[in-house]
């Protein structure tokens, strides 16, 4: 684990440098509109996502599609969870599917930006960075016949703790997940102050590295409180990873959209259309329905409309989904990982 933390910090640092240098390789096509997209991409139709390259020679039609899912928990868990779907995707597209485990949001975004990742599920917050900096085109999320269920930001504490409301946590140990996370970091900075608790002023967020790590840390007494995504927390309780009676919720937000599924903008349009068809004709088996809180299918979404509330949160926290914010957040994430590694390796007194 210590070695992985060190590797994560090193990788994030390298990504930070690579992002700066690669920005100079601007798209040479005549681009009428780019919006907040990186200079590698163009958005002539103003739908806020990258258009397919105008030069058809840049379209990709790989023999194997690389698929990843957001690292909200141990990546190995989701490799097994998604196996029924990746098997279906292979049969439906006629291509080999490679599941690519990622250990951080930054690693997943950089993998798509560099062309090593073709289809991916991104967490709610990092979706914006994936769109603007990696050319991701979100088209689906998990849902039911009634549409998208979404998730809530939960502020959780130990059930035997004295805390009853957010303002009780002033000066306490509060864990956030990672800098780019919506419910784990950005949304609390907007939603907590009206409830009497200001991150950075009333407490210094401790980056745990994930929603599962935050929840487990609260249960273990390492943290006094943590904002976590309700869908991740509910899956942990259902799986027995954490006992529901150990935890009490003292705050619950309005609904946010859950993780998006996106394809790389430079996939051959026929292939991108086929991938979407494969997503929408797949019905979740019982194992996936159980894992995803009753969701039984993929539901069509578009980034411009369905992520408006998330973009608003990002803007209000001073973390718009642009390169400067990404570089700052990635650097902070790398520093948090390095600090955590030092703490883990420090000799116990």
PLM region spans:
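Periplasmic-binding protein-like
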Residues: 70-71, 145-154, 241-279, 286-309
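Bilobed "Venus flytrap"/periplasmic-binding protein-like clamshell domains
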Residues: 67-90, 125, 148-216, 223-225, ...
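N-terminal hydrophobic or amphipathic helices and topogenic motifs
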Residues: 23-107, 291-349
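Ligand-binding "clamshell"
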Residues: 130-142, 236-250
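Hydrophobic residues within well-ordered alpha-helices
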Residues: 112-113, 169, 218-219, 261, ...
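Acidic, polar ligand-binding/catalytic clefts
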Residues: 109-168
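Short beta-strand-to-loop elements that line the ligand-binding cleft
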Residues: 96-103, 201-210, 248-251
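Bacterial N-terminal signal peptides
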Residues: 9-20
């Amino acid at each position: 684990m210590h070695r992985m933390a060190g590797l994560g910090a090193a990788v994030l640092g390298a990504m930070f440098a690579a992002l700066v240098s690669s920005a100079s390789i601007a798209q040479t096509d005549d681009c009428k509109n780019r919006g907040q997209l990186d200079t590698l991409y163009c958005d002539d139709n103003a739908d806020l996502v990258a258009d397919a390259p105008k030069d058809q020679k840049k379209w990709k039609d790989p023999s194997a599609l690389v698929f990843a899912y957001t690292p909200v928990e141990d990546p190995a868990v989701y490799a097994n969870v998604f196996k029924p779907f990746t098997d279906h995707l292979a049969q439906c597209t006629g291509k080999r599917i490679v599941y690519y485990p990622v250990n951080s949001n930054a690693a997943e975004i950089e993998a798509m930006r560099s062309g090593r990742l073709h289809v991916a599920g991104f967490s709610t917050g990092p979706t914006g960075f994936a769109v603007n900096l990696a050319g991701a085109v979100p088209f689906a999320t998990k849902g039911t016949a009634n549409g998208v269920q979404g998730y809530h930001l939960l502020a959780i504490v130990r059930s035997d703790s004295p805390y009853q409301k957010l303002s009780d946590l002033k000066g306490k140990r509060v864990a956030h997940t990672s800098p780019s996370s919506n419910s784990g970091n950005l949304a609390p900075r907007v939603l907590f102050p009206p409830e009497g608790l200001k991150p950075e002023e009333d407490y210094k967020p401790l980056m745990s590295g994930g929603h599962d790590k935050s929840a487990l840390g609260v249960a273990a007494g390492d943290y006094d409180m943590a904002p976590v995504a309700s869908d991740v927390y509910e899956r942990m309780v259902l799986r027995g990873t954490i006992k529901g009676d150990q935890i009490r919720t003292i705050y619950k937000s309005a609904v946010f959209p859950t993780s998006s599924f996106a394809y790389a903008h430079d996939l051959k349009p026929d292939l991108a259309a086929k991938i979407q068809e494969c997503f929408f004709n797949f019905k979740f088996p019982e194992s996936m329905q159980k894992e995803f809180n009753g969701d039984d299918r993929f539901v069509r979404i578009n980034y411009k409309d369905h992520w408006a509330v998330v973009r608003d949160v990002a803007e209000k926290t001073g973390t718009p989904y642009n390169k400067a914010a990404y570089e700052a957040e990635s650097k902070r994430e790398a520093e948090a990982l390095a600090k955590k590694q030092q703490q883990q390796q420090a000799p116990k007194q």
